[in-house]
């Protein structure tokens, strides 16, 4: 038992070391935010927080931004800028809740798809359609690439595996354009760990899309990548939420 505990500890330490990235450096800075605000002059604290704010915006870390805006709001309590940071704080809290809701909807959708796959009941199919509608409503709340990616994932999957006779479109956007825009989002955020893993999901969706329309030359482009990662896709992605 003792040897197993030590082995597990070493494995955990190894995995944590592999997770080191520029993003984790920013989060470490954020973890020391009290040191920044209590141990430094106000002007230095504000400058430091604004630098962290810029880095968090670059990495699209909305939840962490709420912490920065909370402290900037406090530091500007005697300034007219307090209202500005209060607005930013409220906006990012609401946006974070929208992202959280979208992630839960996506997880619930795929759980519901499992029920539909085995039962093929009209009620289960209707529930999936209602979840797509709710996801669409959430995605419309913000001009957010992240919400766009979540909705696209759900919508394309639904039209390929639940309503295969329907044209694969995202609102007024054709599927080909949808895939292209998603790829641009991924390329614009190369250090985003979620997008790094979701790229495999969209390669799988592209493979299924081209197979569905019997465009086999295009399907070949994605087969090797998906086939090589098939075990990971089947074993681990369902555990996450996709």
Model-predicted segments: where are they?
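TPR-repeat structural position
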Residues: 42-43, 62, 82, 165-172, ...
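Intrinsically disordered, low-complexity tails and linkers flanking structured cores
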Residues: 104, 122, 134, 143-144, ...
């Amino acid at each position: 038992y003792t040897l197993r505990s030590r082995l597990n500890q070493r494995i955990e330490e190894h995995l944590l070391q592999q997770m080191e990235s520029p993003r984790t450096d920013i989060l470490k800075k954020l973890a020391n935010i009290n040191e920044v605000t209590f141990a430094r002059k106000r002007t230095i604290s504000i400058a430091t927080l604004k630098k962290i704010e810029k880095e968090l915006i670059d990495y699209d870390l909305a939840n962490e931004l709420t912490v920065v805006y909370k402290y900037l709001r406090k530091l500007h309590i005697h300034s007219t800028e307090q209202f500005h940071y209060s607005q930013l704080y409220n906006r990012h809290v609401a946006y974070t809740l929208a992202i959280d809701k979208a992630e839960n909807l996506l997880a619930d959708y795929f759980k519901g798809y499992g029920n539909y796959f085995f039962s093929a009941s009209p009620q289960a199919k209707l529930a999936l359609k209602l979840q797509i509608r709710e996801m669409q409503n959430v995605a419309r709340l913000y001009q957010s690439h992240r919400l766009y990616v979540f909705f696209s994932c759900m919508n394309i999957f639904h039209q390929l595996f639940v309503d295969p006779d329907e044209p694969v479109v995202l609102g007024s956007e054709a599927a080909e354009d949808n895939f292209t825009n998603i790829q641009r989002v991924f390329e614009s955020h190369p250090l985003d760990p979620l997008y790094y893993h979701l790229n495999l999901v969209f390669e799988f969706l592209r493979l299924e899309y081209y197979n569905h329309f019997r465009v086999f030359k295009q399907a070949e482009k994605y087969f090797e990548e998906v086939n090589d990662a098939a075990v990971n896709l089947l074993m681990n992605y369902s555990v996450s939420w996709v």
